[in-house]
């Protein structure tokens, strides 16, 4: 309806079977003023595209529902892959894998590294395509020039959400901004959601999930406070403070460059 209004249309017509209850509910849920005309077994529906308070309310409600649903794979994944997992205990890829595997994550965790058979006793896989199952969430910690091809692999194998730890994007200048624009274009074309790039991850302390997809050195107590931070240094300090003060958190998101998932998206998710 919004696209039609932008092109100068003021009304829409549709024809459906009169007993197609599901389709009639779709029309009604639009919130647009509607007239129905039944003839024989068909029903003609005429929708006015003039916005009303009710149609605006319905549109905003649908947006909130869609945003919440799109972010769920970030916080409630059944399976997670760390792409760029490393054997070096000091590396971000190793710390991410260790955080996921050592904090009681209730899903399945996979390490992706084409040059290692095992990492910290965990079997590794050369690529997403070699995994025994699709994953919901991919945590990406590869060099910046490899990120775009990794996103292509994610889309091709059914990944639904990304956390891009890798830096070197809009925060470093014009070339980085251009690379980030290409990254965002790929993400949106494939219908994915992405936290980052240039972030340190996300966590969910829900006892049924216990997701720690960060390289922070702490996993906070479970609680009812949700937090996000653009600054990595501030985010790490907040997590350390929550541990020191014994303040429980529900979820934490390091949004980084906020190329896709924004604080506004998170507020809608947390509200719902």
Please provide the spans of the model-predicted regions.
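Catalytic-core regions of core metabolic enzymes
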Residues: 50-272
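Signature of alpha-helical transmembrane segments in polytopic membrane proteins
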Residues: 21, 33, 50-51
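Conserved, charge-rich beta-strand/loop surface module that forms ligand/interface-binding patches
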Residues: 15-21, 60
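Conserved catalytic-core motifs of GNAT/GCN5-like acyltransferases
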Residues: 15, 31-47
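Conserved GNAT acetyl-CoA-binding A-motif
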Residues: 3-16
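Conserved acetyl-CoA-binding loop-helix of GNAT-fold acetyltransferases
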Residues: 1-5, 25-29
């Amino acid at each position: 309806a919004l696209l039609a209004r932008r092109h100068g249309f003021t009304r829409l017509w549709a024809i459906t079977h009169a007993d197609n209850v599901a389709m009639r509910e779709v029309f009604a849920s639009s919130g647009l003023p509607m007239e129905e005309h039944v003839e024989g077994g068909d029903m003609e529906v005429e929708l006015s595209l003039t916005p009303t308070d009710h149609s605006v309310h319905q549109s905003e409600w649908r947006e909130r529902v869609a945003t919440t649903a799109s972010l769920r794979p970030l916080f409630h994944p059944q399976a997670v892959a760390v792409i760029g997992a490393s054997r070096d205990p000091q590396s971000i890829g190793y710390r991410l894998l260790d955080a996921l595997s050592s904090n009681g994550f209730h899903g399945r965790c996979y390490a992706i590294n084409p040059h290692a058979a095992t990492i910290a006793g965990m079997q590794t896989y050369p690529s997403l395509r070699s995994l025994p199952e699709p994953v919901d969430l991919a945590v990406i910690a590869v060099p910046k020039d490899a990120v775009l091809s990794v996103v292509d692999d994610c889309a091709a194998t059914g990944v639904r959400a990304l956390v891009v730890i890798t830096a070197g994007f809009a925060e470093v200048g014009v070339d980085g901004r251009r690379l980030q624009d290409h990254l965002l274009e790929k993400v949106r074309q494939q219908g994915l959601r992405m936290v980052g790039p240039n972030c340190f991850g996300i966590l969910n302390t829900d006892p049924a999930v216990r997701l720690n997809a960060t390289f922070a050195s702490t996993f906070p107590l479970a609680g009812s406070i949700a937090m996000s931070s653009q600054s990595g240094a501030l985010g790490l300090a907040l997590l350390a403070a929550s541990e020191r003060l014994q303040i429980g958190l529900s979820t934490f998101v390091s949004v980084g460059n906020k190329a896709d998932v924004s604080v506004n998206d998170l507020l809608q998710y947390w509200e719902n």
